[in-house]
Structures are given as structure tokens and as C-alpha cells.
């Protein structure tokens, strides 16, 4: 119980970036997935007078500040992007950190259409493997199509209306690692007219 209090306190804190600023949208509502926090990183000197590319990143809890993550590790996205921009290696971008659904992470990140093509025996095997890994208690059924609908039909339009973005494909990217890499790959396959690129690091190819 005490551990849960500590964890809840940590994840509730807003990350402190090395550069730029972070806007948090608390419990962003969706008709497709459960409500979740969205941590939006704005680069140093962000202004409404110019347009920015947007990078949508999975597992948004761990992107910016290692001091408040459960394992005291982070991607240090704000630090890395600021360094790359200063070297003129990339253009400035807004980062949208999408918190995972915690207990629903595997359900939301597992590519749905490939799973639906499996035989009943293969689906039983996937369920058994996930149950052994304590990633599901019931028969496994992905909901990644709904997750991507949330991303494309609800979150992206909100970001494009609330911030100064280039909304076109050439300036819209998605990224993640492990299962986050898998859903990012699925995102660009399902919505090639929305995303111009995907970063799929250490992709969890088996999905179990």
C-alpha cells in the first residue's frame, strides 16, 4: 500500500525538462480508450509565430525526467532534441508524450489486424504466453485499432488546434520502444497518410 502511494505520487508530478517547457493535459478524455495524461514538450523559445513538426511518443511517463519515473530512468527526449536542434541536425519539434494505459498497455500496443489473422490455436498460444508473463488474466484481445483511432481522430486534431504545428504528413511522426515500437510501426502501416515516419526502437517483435 505504501509503495502504491509513492508510485502514484511520483507519476502525478509534472516532469522538469532540461530545456523548453512541458504542458500537461490531465486525464485526456477519449471515446476509444481510457482517459490518460498527455505530457507535451515545447522546445525552448516556442512561439505561435512559427510552425513546428510533431513527434507522438508512446509510454509518455518516461520521456523527460528520470527523477520522477518508477525506475529512475528516462529517454531524456528534451535534452536530446535540444542538442540535435542546436547542431542543426533536425528541425524543431513538439513532442507529445502519450501515457500508456498501464494495465491496458499490452492490449493497446499489440497490432490488432495481424492478431485477428491468427488461427484459434495460435490465439490461445498468445493468451497462454501473456498469462504466464502476468500481462493478461483473461483471453487476450488487442484493442490497438481503437488506440490508433484515439491518436489520429482525437489527440492529433487537439494538438493541431491548440499548438502551432505543421499538421501535414511530412511533419508528423510517431515513436516508441519495445511494445511502443511495435504500435508505432502499426501506426504508420495503418495511417500512412497521417504519419511521415516512425521510430521503432528495440521493437518487441513477438508481442508476448
Roles of regions detected by a PLM:
Residues 1-16:
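Bacterial Sec-dependent N-terminal signal peptides
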